Amino acid sequence: MKKPVVEFSRPLQIDRVPALGSRDRLAAEDKECAALAARLGLFKVHSLSAFLTSMPWRGGGLRITGNLQAEFDQVSVVSLEIFRSSIECDVERYFLPPHKSGQDSEIDSDIIQDGVVDLGEVVSETLVLELDPYPRRPGEVFQDIHEDVEPVKISHFTGLLKLKRDLGGGKN
């Protein structure tokens, strides 16, 4: 089976992570930013970086913590104008070997594939979860076009009243 193409790949061999953990600084290059923008539906990714700590966890697993920073352009769903946004958020993910996956229902963990965890993909996935699916420029408010128009109140008896008036039986 062919592995999917990952736009921002930083593979980490879990057996090379020291007992006291490792620290990594990741930064996407321009080409990776362009590929991520296409994948995430953003107009442009200016920068994406993260500081991560990887620690051995639960006998063969890995705990990844840290934070990410991203700066990007996106299109407002209200005005369709491009505007710049930034995100800074925490990263916290857990990985277990396939034979231990699903044994602990308290913590949501991913499966370690072939002894490797892709730190770049961890960062990309965290960014995706932080993006607003309906982005708007700061201060921009969606307004219904017909907001000022009074709704027409129609009664079920309007037709009968009109018929009564037409037949001359009703008051004006």
Give a label for each model feature.
Residues 38-45, 77-84, 129:
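Short, intrinsically disordered, mixed-charge
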Residues 1-69, 73:
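A positional/architectural concept
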Residues 61-102:
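Helix-adjacent hinge/juxtasegments
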Residues 26, 50-52, 66-68, 87-93, ...:
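A structural signal for short, well-ordered beta-strand segments
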Residues 56, 83-86, 140:
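Juxtamembrane/interface motifs at transmembrane-helix termini
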Residues 1-21, 94-172:
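Charge-rich, low-complexity linker and terminal segments
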